Amino acid sequence: MKYKLVLLAGDTPRARAYAQTLQKHTEDYSIKGFFYGVNKSAALTPSISDAEKDFYSTNNLFIPDFNESILTTFNKNNWEYFTAENKDVNSSEILEGIARFGADLVVFAGFGGQILSHSHFETSHNYLHMHPGDLPLERGSTTIYYSILNRRKCTVTAFFMSKEIDAG
């Protein structure tokens, strides 16, 4: 039996990268999506030159296509998903939608600054999040900038979320 994974996300560059990465792991997971704030578009991203594409390809480095919407990625893979115009990740509509999917794991890639309410953690679902920076040392949304200014390596912390912010 495959592990049931739900991507709870806004259509952000981060969520697009997650979805495109999941394409490489379809044998391990049953993948579904719940996308909210669907009328809010992802930020524009710079294009990659042909020389850069060749470099990444030659060195077997994956670089997501940030111009591909998350819905396009899910449609290409015939993955089930639900969309909501509601931008409130803590709404009953979104909580009920996640419950219907019966996920083993919810990967959260929301819009910047959004914090999940306690209601999400009163379920049997585990929530996984990737935070730029070395938690608990680097908190907030500007961790990459401060890592560079302080001449530290840029890091990402993957953690299971809990009711407490940045404490999972």
Q: What is each PLM-predicted segment?
A:
Residues 1-168:
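One-carbon transfer enzymes
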